[in-house]
Amino acid sequence: MEAGERIDASQLPHRVLETRGHAISILFGFWTSFICDTYIVLAWISKIKGSPDVSASSDEPYARIQQSRRQCHAEEDQSQVPEAG
């Protein structure tokens, strides 16, 4: 095989394809988690900036972030359907 030559997926051993699929799934999970966490933080910041009463309890935002994070991860888990093999 020459440098830069592409390999057809049918030429790869099954184990390589499984590993690649698993790695893509993990990366997708991290990416989804990052997007969810970023959205939660930005929403929280905009709410704080727009709130006239900034002296609210410091525990309350943390609890809301954790609840939103759990909801986001639950939606992520439901969206991942196992592949038929």
UniProtKB/Swiss-Prot annotation:
It is a single-pass membrane protein. Keywords: Membrane, Transmembrane, Transmembrane helix. It comes from the Eukaryota. It is found in: Membrane. The keyword Nucleus does not apply. Its main location: membrane. GO terms for cellular component: membrane. Residues 51-85 are annotated as: Disordered. The chain crosses the membrane at residues 21-43. This is Small integral membrane protein 2.
